[in-house]
């Protein structure tokens, strides 16, 4: 997804006071703008392990998208952001997320659980589930929902689900960047990734 961390591979950013994050950008260079088969529009938690959602161009017959992603990329870290398309079945969402988290851990991958800015399910129960599971499994939590509360309109577009897409650079020397959903999503995700990198390398 070019709208998630992509500018950090494309060089279209100025870190300003966050220059301490540059070693993390360098460490994961090439990972931000590449094609990821594990990211799909409209993905539900229950379709992560459904081969019907896998990219036929990249994935083997019968292979689900997360298994395909792990085979192709051999990741050390996985951002888990689900819930916007999971409404009305919180117990199912919890069960499915547990499967994703356990799959990552079983494969030696650190899952970073990310909360979402929207309220598509009509409440905030999916974010509460995400927080609860991060605590239960003792894995990193990237609580973007808390940051979204500080943004105009939570940083969301008119559909109230997706963040507003802009083509502006991530210039963190410009105060306006701290009012934009994508710029703050990427900065906060990079901070979370930096914390994980430091913990792993200690």
Task: Outline where the language-model segments fall.
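Catalytic His-Asp segment of secreted/periplasmic serine-dependent ester chemistry enzymes
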Residues: 118-202
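Extracytoplasmic/secreted proteins, especially bacterial periplasmic and envelope-associated proteins
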Residues: 65, 74-77, 92-99, 103, ...
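Extracellular/periplasmic catalytic domains that process cell-envelope and extracellular macromolecules
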Residues: 70-74, 106, 135-136, 202
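Short flexible/disordered coil segments
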Residues: 47-58, 98, 104, 141-144, ...
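Conserved SGNH/GDSL esterase-like catalytic core that processes O-acyl groups on lipids
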Residues: 1-92, 166-176
């Amino acid at each position: 997804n070019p709208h998630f961390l992509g500018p950090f591979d494309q060089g279209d950013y100025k870190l300003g006071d966050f220059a301490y994050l540059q070693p993390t950008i360098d460490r994961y260079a090439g990972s931000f703008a590449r094609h990821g088969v594990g990211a799909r529009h409209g993905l539900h938690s229950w379709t992560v392990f459904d081969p019907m959602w896998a990219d036929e161009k990249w994935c083997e017959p019968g292979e689900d998208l997360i298994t395909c992603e792990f085979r192709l990329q051999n990741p050390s870290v996985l951002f888990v952001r689900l819930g916007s398309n999971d409404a009305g079945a919180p117990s199912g969402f919890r069960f499915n997320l547990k499967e994703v988290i356990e799959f990552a851990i079983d494969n030696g991958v650190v899952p970073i659980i990310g909360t979402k800015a929207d309220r598509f399910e009509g409440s905030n129960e999916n974010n509460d589930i995400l927080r609860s599971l991060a605590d239960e499994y003792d894995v990193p939590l990237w609580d973007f929902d808390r940051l979204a509360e500080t943004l105009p309109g939570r940083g969301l577009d008119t559909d109230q689900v997706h963040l507003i897409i802009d083509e502006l650079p991530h210039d963190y020397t410009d105060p306006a960047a701290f009012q934009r959903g994508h710029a703050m999503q990427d900065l906060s995700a990079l901070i979370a990734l930096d914390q994980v990198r430091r913990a792993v390398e200690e």
